[in-house]
Amino acid sequence: MKFLATAATALALAVTANTVAAACDDGEIVIKFSHVTNTDKHPKGIAATLLEQRVNDEMNGKACMEVFPNSTLYNDNQVLEAMLQGDVQMAAPSLSKFEQFTKTFRLFDLPFMFKNINAVDEFQTSETGQAMKESMTRRGLIGLAFWHNG
């Protein structure tokens, strides 16, 4: 009996997963957005859901976004490689994950490096901050913006 309950649960999850994936129509460009947070309480998850709704409303027939929260598709350690392989098109990993490409991103992990969140914003919008973000382009990743992670 326990096996049947487990099998039924697995089937329900598989059907649910297929239903989510079927939201995009044939011919639409599919944009997969993978992140590690929940969708109802964390600002990153809420923003990802709102972006998904906007893309799907405004790009109807041209592009379709599917958001995969809670590491359901990739975790922060895997997502950059998945992007380089074309398996996912958008992600919002912790900035520390970019250290595998360049050590300059360690700057954001140094304690007390910035006086407050406004100082972080000022640095990220500065010429130096923008150069850091753009440094990922030659590695095959395009940074759209910095996103606070805590």
Regions from the PLM with identified roles:
Residues 1-29:
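Short, low-complexity disordered leader/linker segments with a strong preference
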Residues 20-36, 56-63, 137:
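Immediate post-signal peptide segment of exported/extracytoplasmic ligand-binding proteins
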Residues 32-49, 70-74:
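Extracytoplasmic "Venus flytrap"
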Residues 41-66, 126-127:
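Short, polar/charged alpha-helical segment
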Residues 52-53, 89, 94-150:
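Contiguous mixed-secondary-structure segments that line small-molecule binding/active-site clefts
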Residues 60-63, 79-93:
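Alpha-to-beta junction loops
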Residues 67-81:
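Short helix-initiation/N-cap motifs at beta->coil->alpha
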